[in-house]
């Protein structure tokens, strides 16, 4: 099964590749902006390019059955621009399954109905620009007919996978304050295998 991976050289992307590359069920191809010595992929499994460019997104997604995005916001509108390209190509190529990494800021507030966490005091972040960009992506996916999942980790320190953490649909697990990069990648791999959270944002924390 061919998987198109965008954001492979980021922290979660690299950790996911380390775990998933050994699974023979999946044939992973990654779009990368520059050669990256640490990626456990052969050169014929990587495409040099930029997720902001439609033609590069088309190239990596050719014949893919599942798309995974670990793209960050990059301080601009890269995330929403890339997602518009991804959705366009998925529709064109009849690809249904998309898993993407978001942020806990776009989960529902537990205490203020109708608001995202980043719009309330539940979020500790002072800057909301990145969360707004992630929210734009969520709104795009919500309006689509895709089988999507948005994984929404809270504070994301480096760390290896323990496999022990809490998940909750559309809200952050009560009292959750952090989740490691390794465990976020572990849950991404689990969701790839199980498809348990199709059509949901998933709050992720210890």
From Swiss-Prot:
A Pfam family reported for this protein in Swiss-Prot or TrEMBL: NAD_binding_10
Organism: Bacillus subtilis (strain 168)
Gene Ontology MF term list: oxidoreductase activity, acting on the CH-NH group of donors, NAD or NADP as acceptor
Entry-linked InterPro entries: NAD(P)-bd_dom, NAD(P)-bd_dom_sf, Polyketide_Oxido-like
The protein's name in its UniProt record: Uncharacterized protein YheG
Gene3D superfamilies referenced in this protein's UniProt entry, alphabetically: NAD(P)-binding Rossmann-like Domain
Xref: SUPFAM superfamilies: NAD(P)-binding Rossmann-fold domains
């Amino acid at each position: 099964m061919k998987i198109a991976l965008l954001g492979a050289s980021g922290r979660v992307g690299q950790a996911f590749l380390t775990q998933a590359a050994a699974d023979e069920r999946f044939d992973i191809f990654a779009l990368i902006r520059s050669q990256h010595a640490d990626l456990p992929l052969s050169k014929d499994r990587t495409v040099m390019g930029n997720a902001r460019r439609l033609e590069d997104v088309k190239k990596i997604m050719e014949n893919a059955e599942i798309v995974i995005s670990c793209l960050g916001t990059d301080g601009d509108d890269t995330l929403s621009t890339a997602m518009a390209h991804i959705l366009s190509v998925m529709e064109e190529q009849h690809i249904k399954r998309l898993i993407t990494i978001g942020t806990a800021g776009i989960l529902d507030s537990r205490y203020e109905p109708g608001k995202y966490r980043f719009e309330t005091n539940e979020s500790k972040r002072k800057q909301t620009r990145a969360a707004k960009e992630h929210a734009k992506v969520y709104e795009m996916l919500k309006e689509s007919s895709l089988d999507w999942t948005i994984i929404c980790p809270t504070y994301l320190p480096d760390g290896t996978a323990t496999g022990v953490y809490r998940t909750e649909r559309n809200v952050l697990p009560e009292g959750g304050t952090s989740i490691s990069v390794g465990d976020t990648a572990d849950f991404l791999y689990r969701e790839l295998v199980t498809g348990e959270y199709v059509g949901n944002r998933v709050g992720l924390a210890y």
